[in-house]
């Protein structure tokens, strides 16, 4: 039996350039991705380069709090 909290947790990644600009006028919103991470292997915040459909380019997506 597993003890303690689950090792894999669900995290939300948000586009940092959209969030920084506050969803500027030409942007329709803020891009978000849902993924999982292993808490033991990556205890720090996760940052990945993903495609943002609102910026029309690959940008850094950072982990946000729920």
Swiss-Prot record:
A cellular component term, taken from the record's GO annotations: ribosome
Predominant location category: plastid
Compartments, record wording: Plastid, Chloroplast
GO MF term list: structural constituent of ribosome
Gene3D superfamilies (alphabetical): Ribosomal protein L33 (2.20.28.120)
A Pfam match: Ribosomal_L33
BP terms from Gene Ontology: translation
Disulfide bonds: none
Keywords: Chloroplast, Plastid, Ribonucleoprotein, Ribosomal protein
Coiled-coil features, chain-numbered ranges: none
Family of the protein in this entry: Belongs to the bacterial ribosomal protein bL33 family.
Name listed for the protein in its UniProt record: Large ribosomal subunit protein bL33c
Organism per entry: Ceratophyllum demersum
